[in-house]
């Protein structure tokens, strides 16, 4: 399932995407798709905000002007014109998405019809906490997508070979 597919199918709802803050390429895909569908983007979660800011400063993330808005500006836009990129894809109790699901987030309330995408599979051991968050979101009437939206953040064998040939380390542990 691609972001383009999800955005096209859920054009009348707010979209919230939980992903790893460190997966800058995935964040870029989300921003590109949000721009294509004329949506404003809110970044939520301390690690997400910090990493995106650094990635922009270093030129690793291309964000068109006026795409990102502050969370306080959400109320100025119709829900179907917004996307939230957030932490919490692993069900971490203090992450932004978990706080939204538990109704303790100070600025975002999950509404019936919201589309929530878990953009990564649960790491072994996190299944119970991820399921808890999914159940809380579903109970609030959100449409939760958690299958077929995963991309690996790890290098494949050929990518490792390329890195080793470029860096030429004395020792390497993949």
Task: Please place each PLM-identified region on the residue numbering.
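Acidic/His-rich, metal-assisted hydrolase cores and their charged scaffolds
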Residues: 1-174
């Amino acid at each position: 399932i691609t972001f383009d597919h999800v955005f096209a199918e859920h054009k009348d709802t707010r979209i919230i995407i939980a992903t790893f803050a460190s997966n800058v390429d995935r964040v870029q895909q989300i921003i590109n798709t949000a721009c294509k569908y004329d949506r404003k983007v809110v970044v939520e979660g301390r690690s997400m905000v910090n990493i995106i800011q650094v990635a922009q400063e270093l030129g690793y993330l291309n964000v068109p002007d006026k795409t990102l808005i502050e969370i306080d500006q959400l109320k100025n836009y119709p829900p179907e014109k917004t996307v939230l990129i957030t932490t919490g894809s692993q069900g971490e109790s203090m992450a932004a998405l978990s706080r939204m699901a538990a109704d303790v987030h100070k600025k975002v309330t999950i509404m019936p019809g919201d589309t929530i995408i878990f953009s990564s599979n649960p790491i072994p051991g996190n299944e119970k906490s991820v399921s808890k968050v999914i159940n809380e979101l579903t109970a609030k009437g959100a449409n939760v997508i958690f299958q077929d939206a995963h991309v690996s953040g790890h290098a494949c064998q050929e990518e490792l070979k390329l890195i080793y040939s470029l860096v030429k380390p004395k020792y390497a542990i993949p």
